[in-house]
């Protein structure tokens, strides 16, 4: 993850306009809270805070641009540290060259990544390094790894969550060994995967759960998957979630965007752009959901849905890179190595593809009939055309010279 690329969205929090009391956005107060961590002070820092967040960064170059980028990154961390100071969350930086020995000791591997130490766990933040995104992520980490549901209203709230992976289990109580195994499994995925539990017989009946049984909900699916062979050990639950974590249709979220993008299918993503709040975008998304439900058993299919409204700073970049209009629904394949892409031809918003047409297009993608190499061939053809034009121009120039000689 390249930390400096995604900080501008949170950097805007450093400035504020005059507002009524109760809506004052925090501004940096000038106090330095981010620690330059080294072998002498790291043990004290780990003991001092309930959670410690460390940015593992490459050595900062002396050029002006690199210095500015680093200062802006540091400012994002400083503001987050200021906001979260009352909650005993500390922040620090580790230089990959100067503090290489410490980095190895702490298990820091990827430059540009932010690592969170919570008790005995090390969690990598793989999202947009913006103050608001980071603060929300850390507040989620402070919560219990399992949320308990014991009423009809809480069950309704659970049902409303449809764009994320979630698990729910029915247990005798908090002292149950099977619940404890479920809770320990949840810690492996917090806060990226939501774990729920109920001790209420009525709630369990509505969910169709038997004692010590756990259901796994894939995003946007109508029905859950019963995890087989109950009761489960912690290891069995962890293994099941890892095996089924790549959903048929998954949403790109600021808090884990890099992890999702890196989880490609042999270097390729099927990407769909659709604004959920836009009528055409909503309609297109519903078609995508239907396609995903009809093909949920296909292990080779995974579509990444991106709502452009979630990433306003990236809209211009995506439009320029992929040569598409993001004010309209789009679906295509993207090569994650070089960003080459091929997009389905959607004539206009009034003529969106049907679920059957989308399935046919996806089938062509999965079979290799449609691929990003076609895009390279088109580029080569364009280059050849340019060369031919240049040759024609040269021939014309030669003819003109002959005429002049005559």
Curated annotation (Swiss-Prot):
<dbReference type="GO" id="GO:0033018">
    <property type="term" value="C:sarcoplasmic reticulum lumen"/>
</dbReference>
<comment type="similarity">
    <text>Belongs to the calsequestrin family.</text>
</comment>
<keyword id="KW-0514">Muscle protein</keyword>
<dbReference type="InterPro" id="IPR001393">
    <property type="entry name" value="Calsequestrin"/>
</dbReference>
<comment type="function">
    <text>Calsequestrin is a high-capacity, moderate affinity, calcium-binding protein and thus acts as an internal calcium store in muscle. Calcium ions are bound by clusters of acidic residues at the protein surface, especially at the interface between subunits. Can bind around 60 Ca(2+) ions. Regulates the release of lumenal Ca(2+) via the calcium release channel RYR2; this plays an important role in triggering muscle contraction. Plays a role in excitation-contraction coupling in the heart and in regulating the rate of heart beats.</text>
</comment>
<dbReference type="InterPro" id="IPR041858">
    <property type="entry name" value="Calsequestrin_middle_dom"/>
</dbReference>
<keyword id="KW-0325">Glycoprotein</keyword>
<keyword id="KW-0732">Signal</keyword>
<keyword id="KW-0106">Calcium</keyword>
<dbReference type="Pfam" id="PF01216">
    <property type="entry name" value="Calsequestrin"/>
</dbReference>
<dbReference type="InterPro" id="IPR036249">
    <property type="entry name" value="Thioredoxin-like_sf"/>
</dbReference>
<dbReference type="GO" id="GO:0014802">
    <property type="term" value="C:terminal cisterna"/>
</dbReference>
<protein>
    <recommendedName>
        <fullName>Calsequestrin-2</fullName>
    </recommendedName>
</protein>
<feature type="signal peptide">
    <location>
        <begin position="1"/>
        <end position="19"/>
    </location>
</feature>
<feature type="glycosylation site" description="N-linked (GlcNAc...) asparagine">
    <location>
        <position position="335"/>
    </location>
</feature>
<dbReference type="GO" id="GO:0005509">
    <property type="term" value="F:calcium ion binding"/>
</dbReference>
<dbReference type="GO" id="GO:0030018">
    <property type="term" value="C:Z disc"/>
</dbReference>
<dbReference type="InterPro" id="IPR041860">
    <property type="entry name" value="Calsequestrin_C"/>
</dbReference>
<keyword id="KW-0703">Sarcoplasmic reticulum</keyword>
<dbReference type="GO" id="GO:0010881">
    <property type="term" value="P:regulation of cardiac muscle contraction by regulation of the release of sequestered calcium ion"/>
</dbReference>
<dbReference type="InterPro" id="IPR041859">
    <property type="entry name" value="Calsequestrin_N"/>
</dbReference>
<dbReference type="InterPro" id="IPR018233">
    <property type="entry name" value="Calsequestrin_CS"/>
</dbReference>
<feature type="region of interest" description="Disordered">
    <location>
        <begin position="365"/>
        <end position="406"/>
    </location>
</feature>
<feature type="compositionally biased region" description="Acidic residues">
    <location>
        <begin position="373"/>
        <end position="406"/>
    </location>
</feature>
């Amino acid at each position: 993850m390249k930390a400096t690329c995604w900080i501008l969205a949170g950097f805007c929090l450093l400035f504020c306009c005059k507002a009524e009391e109760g809506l004052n956005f925090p501004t940096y107060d000038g106090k330095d809270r981010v620690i330059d961590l080294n072998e002498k002070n790291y043990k004290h820092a780990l003991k001092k805070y309930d959670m410690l967040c460390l940015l593992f960064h490459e050595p900062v170059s002396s050029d002006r641009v690199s210095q500015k980028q680093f200062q802006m990154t540091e400012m994002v961390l400083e503001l987050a540290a200021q906001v979260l100071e009352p909650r005993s969350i500390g922040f620090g930086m580790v230089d990959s060259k100067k503090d290489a020995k410490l980095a190895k000791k702490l298990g820091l591997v990827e430059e540009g990544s932010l690592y969170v130490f919570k008790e005995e766990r090390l969690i990598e933040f793989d999202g947009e390094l913006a103050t608001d995104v980071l603060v929300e992520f850390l507040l989620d980490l402070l919560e219990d790894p399992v949320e308990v549901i014991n009423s009809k209203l809480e069950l309704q709230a659970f049902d409303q969550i449809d764009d994320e992976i979630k698990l729910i289990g029915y247990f005798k109580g908090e002292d149950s060994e099977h619940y404890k195994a479920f809770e320990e499994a949840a810690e492996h995925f917090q806060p990226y995967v939501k774990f729920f539990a109920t001790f209420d017989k009525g709630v369990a009946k509505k969910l169709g759960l038997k004692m010590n049984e756990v259901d796994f909900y894939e995003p946007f699916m109508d029905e859950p998957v019963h995890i087989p062979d109950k009761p489960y050990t912690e290891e069995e639950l962890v293994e099941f979630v890892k095996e089924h974590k790549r959903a048929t249709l998954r949403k790109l979220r600021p808090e884990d965007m890099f992890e999702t993008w890196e989880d490609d299918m042999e270097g390729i993503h099927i990407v769909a752009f659709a604004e959920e709040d836009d009528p055409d975008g909503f309609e297109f998304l519903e078609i995508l959901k239907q396609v995903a439900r009809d093909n949920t058993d296909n292990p080779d299919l995974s579509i990444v849905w991106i709502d452009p409204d979630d990433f306003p700073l990236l809209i211009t970049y995506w439009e320029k890179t992929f040569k598409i209009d993001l004010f309209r629904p789009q679906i295509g394949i993207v090569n994650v190595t070089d960003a080459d892409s091929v997009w389905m031809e959607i004539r206009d918003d009034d003529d969106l593809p049907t679920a059957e047409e989308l399935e046919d297009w996806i089938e062509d993608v999965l079979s290799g009939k449609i691929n990003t190499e076609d895009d390279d061939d088109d580029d080569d053809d364009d280059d050849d055309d340019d060369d031919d034009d240049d040759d024609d121009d040269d021939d014309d120039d030669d003819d003109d010279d002959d005429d002049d000689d005559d």
